[in-house]
């Protein structure tokens, strides 16, 4: 019985190994949301989900920006959200006039989206994703299109395990194979003026990672045709030490910058009035607008929530500028589900603008959170203005699960830490400040991606004030980006990829310490931070790497 049990376990492990998807790129940043399943053909022309050529219900619609004129039809991607991960096959695209096209967008069917998010109506703005092999069963298949003729042969090719590089056809009377043309879908066409296709014809489909399969066509019958096999997914030398899955990608640093940035809302706030998210009547130096509202009594609070949640391990805290119409002694900042451990400033909020830093070590939190709260605990109505709300990037953010410093030379992977920059969208480097100077100076740095970069959003960090309140203890602290990993990948499909996967920076999990009391009253002043020329060069190289990585997908 013990031998039988061991045999069953071994067979199970083998089956699991063969059924799991193989990572083909590093982790990157995108956006994911739910959509309805197609009941008829999408732009890839696979037909109904439950039809003979259908791809099933775990599928994705891409935005036009990422669809690449049909090149990604049939490719599989692992998409990660706050709940978990799913693997989907690309079957459709959404035009630029209908869907956002600044960065990769995955519109997932209900069966797929419920695997990454508990809220079917949410948008996961910081989804992680990577290209993987598909869990295809059986050989690659094809079907002749009904509008084909002996002068015009159109084939739908499906059930491929990895991406298709090319398709050729050689008729009975041809001296050499002819490349079929992709029709912005999973369909490929042969047509030559005045020439007929003579049967039998040989069709060869080549993989993006090397290797090919063949099939012989004897007629234009619309029966399902089977190739000689399926592509073999690369099992090694693609992504070394790949993590089990991608985590949520790093949120952009800016939460409020002259308005709430994309993905943030205040809808969970309570007991407030007169809210204005773009109040131009009062703002700190360097800004043009602030978020203003009246907090009404001791149970009132401003809660800022991010759709699709955010991962705290990329950051060490938040910072913001704030003032009130009267002295306010009862401000508390905390994560909504962890109210018993909070941060409060060492001195009351006054009628003058001041900058505050809240280290996450002062708060009890999980790896993934959805919001944070600014609460009023006094039995008064107080009008507050708040602006320049930013995450503070970890000073030592390094991606995990990829090559470390000792492996880089041999693996073709590079893991980079930017000591003086923070992590913006998709790992693009930007600067972060933990405080402001005591004068009315402004320090800011912005890194924005190019049109071919992974992310379109701009992560910016600024700090300005005429007075300084509670900031992180220990003086000026520089913040680091999550880094970009690039990979030299064998084959023509994916040569490089940028990583925005989970970081090893603290804090991780829940912190311990004082509860139910004012925490971290330490203060320090910091002067404006200046990038060295080497840091600027590193940031520039990161931007170039990110652009090349995404363009190669």
From Swiss-Prot:
Record keywords: Disulfide bond, Glycoprotein, Secreted, Signal
An example Gene Ontology biological process: culmination involved in sorocarp development
Similarity section: Belongs to the expansin family. Expansin A subfamily.
Residues in the signal sequence: 1-19
Segments of skewed composition (Basic and acidic residues): 520-531
Top-level division of the source organism's lineage: Eukaryota
Gene3D superfamilies per UniProt: Expansin, cellulose-binding-like domain (2.60.40.760), Galactose-binding domain-like (2.60.120.260), RlpA-like domain (2.40.40.10)
Residues annotated as glycosylated: 39, 276, 325, 406
Segments for region (Disordered): 421-447, 460-531
Record-linked InterPro entries: Expansin/allergen_DPBB_dom (IPR007112), Expansin_CBD_sf (IPR036749), Expansin_CellWall (IPR051477), Galactose-bd-like_sf (IPR008979), RlpA-like_sf (IPR036908)
Comp. bias intervals (Low complexity): 460-476, 484-493
Subcellular compartments: Secreted
Purpose: May serve to lubricate the movement of the cellulose microfibrils during cell growth and wall extension and/or may serve to maintain the fluid state of the slug cell wall. Overexpression shows aberrant stalk formation.
Disulfide bonds: 44-73, 76-134
Native species: Dictyostelium discoideum
The protein, known as: Expansin-like protein 7
Gene name linked to the record: expl7
């Amino acid at each position: 019985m013990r031998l039988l049990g061991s045999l069953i376990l071994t067979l199970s492990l083998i089956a699991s190994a063969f059924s799991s998807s193989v990572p083909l790129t590093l982790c990157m940043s995108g956006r994911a949301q739910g959509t309805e399943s197609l009941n008829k053909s999408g732009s890839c022309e696979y037909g109904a989900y439950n039809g003979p050529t259908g791809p099933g219900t775990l599928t994705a619609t891409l935005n036009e920006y990422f669809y690449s004129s049909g090149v990604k039809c049939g490719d599989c991607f692992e998409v990660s959200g706050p709940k978990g991960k799913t693997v989907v096959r690309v079957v459709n695209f959404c035009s630029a006039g209908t869907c956002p096209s600044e960065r990769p967008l995955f519109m997932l069917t209900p069966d797929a989206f419920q695997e990454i998010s508990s809220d079917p109506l949410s948008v996961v703005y910081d989804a992680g994703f990577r290209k993987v092999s598909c869990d295809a069963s059986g050989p690659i298949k094809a079907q002749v299109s009904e509008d084909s003729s002996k002068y015009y042969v159109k084939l739908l090719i499906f059930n491929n395990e990895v991406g298709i590089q090319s398709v050729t056809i050689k008729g009975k009377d041809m001296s050499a194979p002819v490349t079929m043309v992709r029709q912005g879908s999973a369909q490929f066409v042969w047509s030559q003026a005045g020439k007929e296709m003579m049967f039998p014809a040989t069709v060869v489909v080549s993989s993006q990672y090397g290797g090919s399969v063949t099939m012989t066509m004897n007629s234009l019958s619309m029966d399902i045709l089977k190739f000689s096999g399926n592509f073999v997914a690369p099992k090694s030398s693609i992504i070394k030490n790949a993590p089990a899955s991608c985590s949520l990608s790093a949120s952009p640093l800016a939460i409020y910058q002259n308005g709430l940035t994309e993905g943030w809302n205040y809808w969970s706030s309570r007991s407030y009035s007169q809210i204005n998210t773009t109040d131009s009547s009062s703002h700190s130096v360097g800004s043009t607008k602030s978020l203003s509202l009246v907090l009404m009594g001791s149970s009132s609070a401003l809660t800022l929530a991010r759709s699709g949640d955010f991962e705290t391990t990329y950051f060490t805290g938040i910072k913001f500028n704030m003032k009130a119409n009267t002295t306010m002694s009862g401000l508390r900042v905390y994560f909504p589900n962890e109210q018993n451990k909070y941060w409060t400033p060492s001195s009351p909020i006054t009628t003058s603008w001041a900058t505050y830093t809240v280290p996450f070590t002062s708060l009890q939190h999980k790896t993934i959170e959805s919001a944070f709260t600014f609460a009023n605990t006094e039995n008064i109505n107080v009008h507050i203005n708040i602006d320049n709300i930013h995450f503070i990037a970890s000073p030592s953010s390094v991606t995990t699960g990829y090559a470390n410093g000792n492996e880089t030379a041999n693996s073709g992977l590079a893991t980079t830490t930017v000591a003086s920059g923070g992590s913006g969208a998709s790992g693009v480097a930007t600067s972060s400040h933990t405080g402001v100077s005591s004068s009315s100076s402004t320090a800011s740095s912005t890194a924005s991606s190019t049109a071919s970069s992974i992310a379109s959003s701009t992560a910016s960090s600024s700090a300005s004030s005429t007075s300084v309140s509670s900031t992180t203890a220990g003086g000026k602290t520089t913040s680091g980006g999550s880094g970009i990993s690039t990979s030299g990948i064998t084959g023509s499909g994916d040569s490089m990829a940028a990583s925005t996967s989970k970081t090893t920076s603290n804090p991780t999990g829940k912190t311990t310490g004082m509860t139910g009391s004012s925490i971290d009253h330490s203060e320090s002043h910091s002067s404006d931070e200046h990038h060295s020329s080497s840091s600027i060069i590193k940031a520039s190289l990161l931007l170039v790497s990110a652009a090349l990585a995404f363009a190669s997908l």
